[in-house]
Design a protein with these regions (language model features):
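Residue-level signature of mid-helix packing/kink "hotspots" within the transmembrane helices
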Residues: 33, 61-69, 154-155
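Helix-to-loop junctions at the C-terminal end of transmembrane segments
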Residues: 67-80
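Hydrophobic core of transmembrane alpha-helices in multi-pass small-molecule transporters
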Residues: 24, 94, 105-122
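Helix-loop-helix hairpin linking two adjacent transmembrane segments in secondary transporters
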Residues: 150-171
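C-terminal ends and interior cores of transmembrane alpha-helices
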Residues: 89-103
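Intracellular juxtamembrane helix-capping segments at the cytosolic ends
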Residues: 42, 119-135
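Pair of pore-lining "gating" transmembrane helices in MFS-fold secondary transporters
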Residues: 11-34
């Protein structure tokens, strides 16, 4: 006989998988783990120093830290779906902007700023809220499984980004 604990996991595993994928694609995860593979091709093409390039990441991180409490509040008020979906579009706009950089350093800062601000609703707090409100007996396990998205991205994104860059260029 399957108890309520096992049923909870069996019935809601798609939510765990969706949360894991959401965390992988978040503005706090994917851009940070793929940036190392882009450092050399971008800095060589535009003649920027590593410090200039990495400053855009610092800028984005600062914006992310400032917006996190607001995103938590928005999740409480509107729910994760209404926060995440528009933010995924915003994050995509930021990524598209990054692909159009023509050598102006301010464009890099703009693109990473857009990823941080417009994609702010994709941060893990949004995705994990769905887990926290849907699981009761196995909430910790469900959160742990969902948060493996960060480790998966850290393991896969750099290698995949290098391969994509080799095949198609950094844009």
């Amino acid at each position: 006989m399957v108890g309520p604990t096992e049923r909870e996991l069996a019935q809601r595993w798609p939510l765990i998988m969706a949360t894991c994928m959401g965390i992988i694609s978040s503005s706090f995860v994917l851009p940070y783990y793929s940036i190392g593979a882009l450092l050399t091709p971008v800095t060589e093409e535009f003649g920027w120093s590593r410090a200039q390039f990495q400053a855009a990441i610092l800028f984005s991180s600062g914006l992310g830290a400032l917006t996190s409490p607001l995103i938590g509040w928005l999740n409480d008020k509107y729910g994760p779906r209404r926060v995440a979906l528009p933010s995924l579009i915003g994050l995509s706009i930021g990524l598209l902007t990054a692909s159009q950089i023509q050598g102006d350093l301010w464009m890099l800062f703009l693109a990473y700023g857009m990823m941080a601000l417009l994609g702010a609703g994709t941060i893990p707090v949004t995705w994990t809220r769905a887990i926290a409100t849907s699981f009761f007996k196995r909430r910790g396990l469900a959160l742990g499984l969902a948060l493996t998205g960060t480790g998966i991205c850290a393991s896969v994104a750099p290698h995949y980004t290098v391969w994509l860059t080799d095949q198609f260029g950094w844009r």
